């Protein structure tokens, strides 16, 4: 398979198919834009941003990217019209977005895409694990010639694969990034690697993942679950398990082929990756009055939480541990996190949503997750970042998690310092975006 085909296959595996248009449609849209440019020059309409985001719904973190960026646009660019071009907003996500952002137009067909290409002034690629919608950014650039930017991505050479991307595929991505008005990377190693690979966009800097700004809530669902399981506000911690590679092949609707190499790596590390979490749970229960909620960030983690954590705990500890058996959406999850004393585990975006609200959160990571976890160092939380492949880091996990329960006030203060730093960076990025938007005439 050609290197570019390999890269595109990986993108499609992650994001799925999105609304697209034919070459004839592109030609028609380009012609319409040319004809409408004269009228645009004399108009006084709102400027229009096309947000390319919403990659998948099997992970509440991937859901959170979009409402986070939409909230920033709502706050800092209230006079700008926003259209969302999603890959997947099923499983109730569309309803969440429409209820929270009723003024945002959601693109659902190739005709909508063609209209957006014609009528929008700026394309903003949302946060993600890489330049997920690279082909759509290329389409925008080639068919419209209008400006675009990238908001909070990781840049790596593997896209969550066990093998590196071909140099040709990386070069193609760099070419797209170089055409952007700005590229914001969500972790500093991504910025450094992009520069090393030849990326030289006019503005390149760190910016927090869009999910930090998410404000979705579902208080009724969260309160009902917590009441049912006697979990009282600020008297419990959340814990999230995770395989090194998400086993998408276990989710029927994804129809992802079994990946033997990824599964082998998962099974090789799964015990070592969860033993520190188990011990932390034991110490929390036996040394403090707090309980622990085992909860998921994606649809593969409920079973993992039971088999690797709950079922292997001593009976006296199990009595104060609640296992959530079903998946949830971002609003209910975030409402739950807001009522907790903090969160720890092997995931990234639930901690992001916590820190975005000033809730303490500890991140355990490994190389297979790319460099995204290093954002914790970028925002001043290096003491809450642990590399599971470094024995010295592993030794510090349990005592550090325990401090969330023994010194909740100190932990909250630390989280809020990081939150304020993130918010300042968000303001800077929105000012940059505002400065790059074309005048509306």
Regions found by a protein language model. Give the residues of each.
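Short, charge-enriched, intrinsically disordered boundary segments that mark the beginning
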Residues: 1-6
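Active-site anion-handling motifs in enzyme catalytic cores
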Residues: 7, 11-14, 18-21, 30, ...
């Amino acid at each position: 398979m050609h290197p570019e085909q390999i890269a595109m296959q990986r993108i499609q595996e992650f994001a799925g198919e999105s609304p697209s248009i034919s070459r004839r449609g592109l030609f028609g849209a380009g012609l319409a834009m040319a004809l409408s440019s004269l009228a645009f020059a004399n108009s006084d309409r709102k400027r229009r941003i096309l947000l390319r985001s919403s990659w998948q719904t099997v992970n509440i973190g991937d859901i959170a990217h979009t409402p986070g960026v939409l909230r920033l646009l709502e706050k800092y660019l209230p006079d700008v019209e926003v259209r969302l071009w999603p890959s997947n907003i099923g499983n109730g996500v569309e309803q969440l977005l429409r209820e929270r952002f009723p003024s945002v137009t959601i693109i659902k067909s190739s005709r909508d895409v063609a209209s957006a290409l014609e009528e929008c002034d700026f394309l903003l690629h949302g946060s993600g694990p890489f330049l997920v919608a690279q082909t759509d950014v290329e389409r925008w650039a080639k068919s419209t010639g209008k400006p675009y930017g990238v908001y909070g991505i990781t840049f790596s050479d593997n896209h969550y694969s066990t093998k590196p991307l071909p140099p040709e595929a990386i070069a193609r991505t760099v070419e797209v990034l170089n055409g952007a008005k700005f590229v914001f990377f969500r972790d500093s190693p991504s910025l450094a690697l992009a520069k090393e690979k030849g990326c030289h966009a006019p503005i390149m800097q760190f910016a927090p993942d869009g999910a930090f700004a998410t404000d979705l809530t579902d208080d009724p669902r969260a309160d009902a679950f917590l009441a049912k399981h006697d979990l009282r506000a600020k008297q419990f911690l959340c814990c999230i398990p995770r395989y090194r590679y998400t086993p998408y092949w276990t989710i029927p609707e994804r129809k992802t082929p079994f990946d033997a190499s990824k599964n082998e790596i998962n099974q090789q590390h799964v015990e070592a990756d969860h033993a520190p979490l188990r011990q932390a749970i034991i110490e929390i229960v036996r040394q403090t009055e707090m309980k622990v909620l085992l909860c998921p960030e994606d649809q593969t983690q409920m079973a993992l939480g039971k088999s690797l954590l709950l079922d292997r705990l001593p009976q006296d500890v199990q009595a104060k541990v609640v296992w959530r058996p079903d998946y949830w959406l971002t609003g209910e999850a975030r409402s739950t996190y807001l009522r907790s004393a903090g969160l720890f585990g092997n995931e990234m975006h639930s901690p992001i949503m916590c820190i975005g609200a000033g809730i303490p959160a500890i991140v355990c990571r490994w190389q297979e997750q790319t460099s995204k976890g290093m954002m914790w160092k970028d925002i001043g939380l290096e003491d809450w970042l642990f590399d599971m492949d470094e024995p010295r880091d592993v030794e510090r996990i349990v005592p550090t998690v325990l401090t969330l329960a023994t010194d909740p006030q100190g932990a909250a203060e630390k989280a809020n310092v990081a939150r304020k730093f993130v918010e300042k960076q968000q303001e800077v990025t929105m000012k940059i975006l505002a400065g790059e938007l074309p005048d509306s005439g």
